[in-house]
């Protein structure tokens, strides 16, 4: 099955105080799996960037300059750590959100959960732990989810928060304290 990502921007005109107001309605891209390549593609589309845009910013030239990025997005090629950092700067995203997860530290699991919600938006997770890092993450995440649900923030603002979120103790090694 082809992994298709799609997004739409719709404009909705309405009257407000006697004036015609145009509201932008954003429908998010669809995430079909949680592979590193699909996550990179999701953010690229969210940012309204083409493979050409990113290839240019990475300094890739030649007739087939998009090939490298296509291979990243399909998972056929792994980036070096420095290339991943360059890519995250271009995409304006925390590099931990688009890295390959090894699940050797708490932060990998927490970042994975942020992506899991993109596939299953109504998911609710309670790990029932006493770990301070995990509890802080869930407090902050649930606060932002509530703001989105109450329409205090829109999806774009919520997703911006997610892709730039930094787990407070990123370097913690995963252990079985609980």
Please tell me what each predicted stretch does:
Residues 11-34, 38, 42, 78, ...:
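Charged, helix-prone or intrinsically disordered regulatory segments positioned adjacent to compact structured domains
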Residues 46, 57, 90:
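Residues within the alpha-helical elements of helix-turn-helix
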Residues 140-178:
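Charged, low-complexity intrinsically disordered regulatory/assembly segments
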Residues 41-44, 51:
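Short, cationic motifs built from Arg/Lys/His that form the positively charged side of catalytic pockets
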Residues 59-79, 100-104:
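Recognition helix of helix-turn-helix/homeodomain-like DNA-binding domains
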Residues 53-58, 87:
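Short alpha-helical "recognition helix" segments of helix-turn-helix
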